[in-house]
Amino acid sequence: MIGNDPLDLGGQIAFVTGAGQSAGRAIALALAKHNAGGVAVNDFVPERAAAVAAEIEALGVRAVAVPSDVGDYAAVKAAFAAAEALGPVTLLVNNAGNAGPNASMGRSPNFWETEPGDWDRYFRTNLQGVMNCCHVALPEMVKQGKGRIVTVVSDAGRVGEAKLAAYAAAKAGAAGFVRSIAREAGRFGITSNAISLSALEPPMDDEAKAAFLASEQAKLITSRYAIRRMGRPDDVAAMALFLCSDAASWITGQTYPVNGGYSFAQ
């Protein structure tokens, strides 16, 4: 989509983490549809990264699958090196996250029932992963004199969430990091903003998703929102696209709730 598109990305190269499914996939596709010059698709699962890269190429946009564990600094450096085949990365979306397999079901253990190794897993992906990607991406952005960094955080980091203490702490740390980078990098034409999410529809097949959304657990979750539904991947992608575009060129250090009104509807 080019021409009079106010969200036209001007052929810039994007690197999206956690892009193999759900919101990350939607973000990668949205950037491709709005004139990104190429998209580096990063995901922990190589097959998912490759599948989304193929979807983007089918749109006529260059893409490369660059799978890695974002918590592994050496792996992140290698992923960015592979992305250089597309050109210099000036759009970074830190979407990769880990809340644990049972978070949306309310079956995570109490904090005092967890082990330190559990905390490490949450901090590795949700905070260290963001720092790793920014540390590798920023030198090139500074060299280019421009850049957009968008980081997905969580309402859990702002208000707290029972049975997700380590996850909430990591996401709160990421939100603080976003603001610090905004202060450091702004003079180089680089913005740093965050999107704060609540619960998204789980990445299931249509039948399983319909069953979950009709469940009492899903109804309990959505009862906390002014808009009585769970978030959808495209909801997140729309905000990420805006923050990556020139329409947001004088916005930095901000955290935008994309949460159906959870911020005030409790």
Q: What is each model feature region?
A:
Residues M1-D5, V159, K219, S223, ...:
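Short C-terminal tail/terminal secondary-structure segment
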Residues P139, R183-E184, S249:
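Alpha-helical segment proximal to the catalytic Tyr-Lys
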Residues I2, P6-A40:
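Canonical Rossmann dinucleotide-binding motif of NAD(H)/NADP(H)-dependent dehydrogenases/reductases
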Residues S154:
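Residue(s) in the substrate-gating loop at a strand-loop-helix junction
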Residues T90, N98, W112-M131, K146, ...:
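Catalytic Tyr-X3-Lys loop
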Residues G186, T191, S196, I251-G253:
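Short, small/polar-rich loop/turn modules that mediate ligand/substrate recognition or access, typified
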Residues K77, A99-D120, K143, K163-A166:
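Conserved mid-core segment of classical short-chain dehydrogenase/reductases
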